[in-house]
From Swiss-Prot:
Chain's role: Hemocyanins are copper-containing oxygen carriers occurring freely dissolved in the hemolymph of many mollusks and arthropods.
Annotated Cu cation B binding sites: 344, 348, 384
Domain of life: Eukaryota
Record's protein name: Hemocyanin B chain
Note: The B chain contains two copper-binding sites. Three histidine residues are ligands to each copper ion.
Effect of residue 49 to Q: In minor component B'
Residues that, per the record, bind Cu cation A: 194, 198, 224
SUPFAM superfamilies: Di-copper centre-containing domain, E set domains, Hemocyanin, N-terminal domain
Pfam families assigned: Hemocyanin_C, Hemocyanin_M, Hemocyanin_N
Compartmental location: Secreted, Extracellular space
Reported impact of residue 561 to A: In minor component B'
Disulfide bonds: 93-98, 483-502, 562-609
One GO cellular component term noted in the UniProt record for this chain: extracellular region
């Protein structure tokens, strides 16, 4: 940055901008900017000479922007456009001064939800945002993550000036079988992973914003496939069958009562049990979705899609799933949105609106219309099982891998061991809900926290003993998967049946010297997961201390919040223990990373979230080598670089550190 703004100052600015988002800023420097800054005063501060700022200022001056104290949904076209106009302004800033000034100015003038969304995606995608850790959304907009009962208690605590920590219970009762797995869909870390992935890979992204989102369509498939597979693992751990796919012409069996409220806009709508899909005014007719689906099935059966100019594009090739993901979601990368529509996005809005499909009661959007809250609704996983089966039809159209495809010559995996027991348990996690309550002139803030039960596991280490029978050192890619052995009825699954339910535990690159070698890898280093985020309070303290002490701030370990929470790497399992197959596939790292920064430890969460602004670090299809049909298990068993062992995971009801 030309002004030499350090990470500590940037972090402090972002903290201040997001503090008490529903109230005017209390920080004098930001207040001064908000009153006196003119976004069009000096257009040389922007790369586009102020074109984006001019467009947004026109909307503001014409009183066309959504008012404050109103709900915001990304699935609402106009509201999304407004948020993106602010993103465009911030994204065009050359220096931090411009970024900070515009953010402070529009914070006081734009809808709070639009502002938060625009600020988050700008920090994620702009070079100026490097080094900044975005505070956990569950502390910035707690209403989206916390049930109404707890928010009410928070108000009471504030008014009576009594600090408090309040227990959040999962929705539903024991009469509802789905309640057994509510801890998964309602986990605040899982919600953050889902909402952040959609910020990292937004549907609206165009390369003119600065770079290409590599393999976005394929990652859309893989991330949601893994969420669904993980949900099925949790169901298996709770004596439930795998989630059933959604059908447009059948009833939606499971209703959902979210028991959460918007900060402004009333309660999230309830959907009763056993309702038929209805057309939704202003969104779509059910029949439209059936037509869209049949066109996608046609493309898979033909092996090609038709682009908007009428040309055919072959999808029976490695990049095929990428093209398919883009049209199913759909994103701006879709080859032909007019013809293939937007199956996933429209379906989210359709499900969100089933409580009030004709706008008769003027209800706000449902939980499915926010990425923060979508996974709470059991129908989210039914919708994604439906999408997942479309992708499976495509991957099943490829020939199975042969021995030669899978072999990494000279590389032998001799054994796999786990150092440490695979034990899961629930523990308590606290987060602040101070931002949920309003501040009065004379009412001091008191500590108000929500306490939730979250799944966790003991740390463990993989020990992979192997032999590299080649002359020299080789770069290897280690791919680790956990696969079910039996279904919910105790029937043994073939590998071909199990492979689609496997979950990715880790993927890493490592040089293996010639001769025998033992590779050790800690569960906490997984490229699939992220650690718990620092609290907003902790981010504020660290930034303030660094600024006051004149030293810089390095929070790079937390820079990405896209990734499965560390604590949820393993499925819960059962108290008596469950057995699973642990697969380790070692593949040729030079081929896998050809054309990339080979052998470099990408760290972070590249397995499901890629690397910002760079090509995806692995050339193989996501899910390799289990993503294609395996009619004959002997092919997998016959290569020396792939091995599996049976592991046992036990759930402890009482946890003692």
């Amino acid at each position: 940055d030309a002004l030499g703004t350090g990470n500590a100052n940037k972090q402090q600015d972002i903290n201040h901008l997001l503090d008490k988002i529903y109230e005017p800023t209390k920080y004098p420097d930001l207040k001064d900017i908000a009153e006196n800054f003119n976004p069009l005063g000096d257009t040389s501060i922007y790369n586009d000479h102020g074109a984006a700022a001019e467009a947004l200022m026109k909307e503001l001056n014409d009183h066309r922007l959504l008012e404050q104290r109103h709900w915001f949904s990304l699935f609402n076209t106009r509201q999304r456009e407004e948020a993106l106009m602010l993103f465009a302004v911030l994204n065009q800033c050359k220096e931090w001064y411009c970024f900070r000034s515009n953010a402070a100015y529009f914070r006081e003038r734009m809808n709070e939800g639009e502002f938060v969304y625009a600020l988050y995606v700008s920090v994620i995608h702009s070079k100026l945002g490097d080094g900044i850790v975005l505070p956990p959304l569950y502390e910035i907009t707690p209403h989206m993550f916390t049930n109404s009962e707890v928010i009410d208690k928070a108000y009471s605590a504030k008014m009576t000036q009594k600090p408090g920590t309040f227990n959040v219970s999962f929705t539903g009762t024991k009469k509802n079988r789905e309640q057994r797995v509510a801890y998964f869909g309602e986990d605040i870390g899982m919600n953050i992973h889902h909402v952040t992935w959609h910020m990292d890979f937004p549907t609206w992204w165009q390369d003119s914003y600065g770079y290409h989102l590599d393999r976005k369509g394929e990652l859309f498939f893989w991330v949601h496939h893994q969420l669904t597979a993980r949900f099925d693992f949790e169901r298996l751990s709770n004596w439930l069958d795998p989630v059933d796919e959604l059908h447009w012409d059948r009833i939606i069996r499971e209703g959902f009562a979210p028991l959460t409220s918007y900060k402004y806009g009333g309660e999230f709508p309830v959907r009763p049990d056993n309702i038929h899909f209805e057309d939704v005014d202003g969104v779509a007719h059910v029949h439209d979705l059936e037509i869209t689906e049949s066109r996608i099935h046609d493309a898979i059966d033909h092996g090609y899609i038709t682009d908007s100019d009428g040309h055919t594009i072959d999808i029976r090739q490695p990049k095929g799933i990428e093209l398919l993901g883009d049209i199913i979601e759909s994103s701006m990368y879709s080859s032909n949105v007019q013809y293939y529509g937007s199956l996933h996005n429209t379906a989210h809005a359709m499900l969100g609106r089933q409580g009030d499909p004709h706008g008769k009661f003027n209800l706000p959007p449902g939980v499915m219309e926010h990425f923060e809250t979508a996974t709470r609704d059991p129908s989210f996983f039914r919708l994604h099982k439906y999408m997942d089966n479309i992708f499976k039809k495509h991957t099943d159209s490829f020939p199975p891998y042969t021995h030669d495809d899978l072999e990494f010559a000279g590389m032998v995996v001799d054994g796999i061991a786990i150092d440490g027991e695979l034990i899961t348990f629930f523990d308590e996690f606290q987060y602040s809900i101070l931002n949920a309550v309003d501040s009065g002139e004379n009412i001091e803030d008191v500590d108000i926290n929500a306490r939730v039960h979250r799944l966790n596991h003991n740390e463990f280490t993989y020990k992979i003993t192997m032999s590299n029978n080649n002359d020299g050192e080789r770069l290897a890619t280690f791919r680790i998967f956990l696969c079910p052995i039996e279904d919910n009825n105790g029937i043994t699954l073939t590998l071909d049946e199990a492979r689609w339910f496997c979950i990715e535990l880790d993927k890493f690159f490592q040089k293996v010297p010639s001769g025998p070698e033992t590779i050790e890898r800690s569960s906490k280093d997984s490229s699939v997961t992220v650690p718990d985020m620092p609290s907003f309070q902790s981010l504020k303290e660290q930034a303030d201390n660094a600024v006051n002490g004149g030293h810089d701030l390095d929070l790079s370990a937390y820079e990405r919040s896209c990734g499965i929470p560390d604590r949820m790497l393993l499925p819960k399992s059962k108290p008596e223990g469950m057995k699973f197959n642990l697969y380790v596939a070692v593949t040729d790292g030079d081929k896998d990373t050809e054309g990339h920064n080979g052998g470099h430890d990408y760290g972070g969460t590249h397995a499901q979230c890629g690397v910002h602004g760079e090509a995806f670090p692995d050339n193989r299809p996501l899910g390799y080598p289990l993503e294609r049909r395996i009619p004959d298990e002997r092919v997998i068993d016959g290569v020396s670089n792939i091995k599996h062992v049976v592991v046992k995971i036990v759930h402890h009801l009482e946890h003692h550190d």
